[in-house]
Amino acid sequence: DAVKLGDEATVIYTSGTTGMPKGVVLTHGNFISPMLQAYDFLPLLINDPKSRSLLFLPVAHVLARFVMYCLLAGQGITAFSPDTRNLVNDIATFKPTMLLVVPRVMEKVYNAAAAKAGGGMKGRMFAWAAKQARALSKASAYVDSPLPESAVAGPGPDTTPIPDASAMPSPGPSTALKLRGRVADALVLSKVRAILGPNLHTIISGGAPLALDLANFYRGLGITLLQGYGLSETTGPISVETPQDFPPDSVGFPWPGNRMKIAPDGELLVQGISVSKGYHNLPEATAEAYVDGWFKTGDLASIDDRGHLRITGRKKELIVTAGGKNVSPEVLEESLSTHPLIANIIVV
């Protein structure tokens, strides 16, 4: 018998950070349907014969699995690096046009460059150049403007359109900022970019939140940085930024064929072609994870009037202060994670 879209394709286990690992059942349709959308959504990354993609995430990770399938079905060349300790050598050998990494890899590259600069004049020069890179990124971001309600939540999971911001650029960097950027590039930024290879134009960051300062630094290098959001239960990315639209703090728009909404308590709910049908041999956990056909992600989020998704924390990790205020520790952790003296951080 022919394989059908609704047939089970694989079981990927959750990390177990919030309890015992659960086997997420993903169907062939969970992979194939979003993949077909990817060729239109991100054609230069997925279906360009000149693309050379280097993956640092293990393919046991759902994001790496999904991206691998997309790339193998496309026209480019795909390579895998089993150990991030070989990052620089693998990049130098393969000369990728695209990297798939976790934020920790990006932190290591940044911290290594800062440590190499050291203190004194070189250290101050690196800090100044990094500041110019972030300023260039912020000045080149795209301006939010309201879209019709239908662009935020369509009538069904297969009709949610993706907003087009290509006609809404910001005023751009000033002449003075451009001049400072050229000086910063000549003195520092070009050397950091050289570590990432001569052909690199895109980095896809996933698997964990990326600090905003770090995102702006890499974009200021002239690299297209795409962030997304997803879980094992959503077959990896259920929202993603596009090269035309990447506002600060956002993790993009719903992947075509999916919908999102915010519950009264602030939790993000999702449904659509990417969402798993449940957990393997765990009917009670499956029933608890869904409400009226919507999957409860466990993440706190907001969606602006243009459909940009922003993740603000985990529902179970909120810290309640003595004054009764709810505080998400992730905001503090992200702001501190780029410090060169900090390898790992947790706010309790």
Residue ranges, per PLM feature:
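Conserved ATP-binding/catalytic segment of the ANL
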Residues: 254-321, 338
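C-terminal boundary motif of the adenylate-forming
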Residues: 300, 339-348
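Conserved AMP-binding/adenylation subdomain of ANL enzymes
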Residues: 32-52, 59-151, 162-164, 171-182, ...
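Conserved AMP-binding A3 loop
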Residues: 9-35
